[in-house]
């Protein structure tokens, strides 16, 4: 076990005194790291995620290289879907492709439930390896939110408009709610197993829920999010982070959920979130594109985010979306160092 562990992010969420604003980056594991690219010359994404030693190495790299205050498990949000009967393939340059999309309630009924120890032991073994032997910062486990998972399962892959997903919601509520309930059950079991293996925080990625308006979110999504988070927290008192893209119109709905941290994309400032009445710890929210700019521009954009975060009092620095593959690793290291130095107290 690790002594003198850096629990800054957990202290921030609890409202305890910290020495600096904690920082981590979505998609910090992999992508922009040269060590990861070298691995990808030999191993596929599937190979890496199914070999705990390799996966733990990739997960741990950004903590060593960038000195982040948390690690996030290197996995894909599709991980729990294949064991329940979803024929999913990750295609380079496209993303998840589903070969048996959900169209009817019979398709939902064919889905099985997940047994994490039986179906995804490599996920749990990776977490145990990290938490028992190596990691000196909290590990973030994660899952895709029911809407985002369902959108892939219904559309058959990435979508711009989510027409099939919305069509099912509006014209076949029985199938929609059956799918939501099934995915909540899967997510609760998957997340609970991650926590029991050693994950100390959970992030729920609702990447595409911004496609819905407030009324539809309340009717078709919110009750299921409440059940998912509540059932996880009934089992374990674990902090939960919720993040989505282009969902500023849903901020007040999210603030009602039993989450601990609300992740902002780059379109909504910390001050704006406060003015909207958000009471949760805030996470974010540098535009990831800024990391491709010269350092003086990056620093200029970092300061107001950090100033607003310090004024708010409960802030975790992150990007407003994931790290782009083109971002230089040294830039991420400098950002992490700047956040720690600028917010030191």
UniProtKB/Swiss-Prot annotation:
Main localization of the protein described in the UniProt heading: cytoplasm
GO BP, sorted A to Z: protoporphyrinogen IX biosynthetic process
UniProt xrefs under Pfam families: URO-D
Reactions it catalyzes: uroporphyrinogen III + 4 H(+) = coproporphyrinogen III + 4 CO2
UniProt pathway annotation: Porphyrin-containing compound metabolism; protoporphyrin-IX biosynthesis; coproporphyrinogen-III from 5-aminolevulinate: step 4/4
Subcellular location: Cytoplasm
Keyword Cytoplasm: yes
Annotated residues for binding of substrate: 27-31, 46, 76, 152, 207, 321
The protein's role, per its UniProt record: Catalyzes the decarboxylation of four acetate groups of uroporphyrinogen-III to yield coproporphyrinogen-III.
Family listed: Belongs to the uroporphyrinogen decarboxylase family.
The protein's assembly and partners: Homodimer.
Stated name of the protein: Uroporphyrinogen decarboxylase
Organism of origin: Staphylococcus aureus (strain bovine RF122 / ET3-1)
Name of the gene this protein is made from: hemE
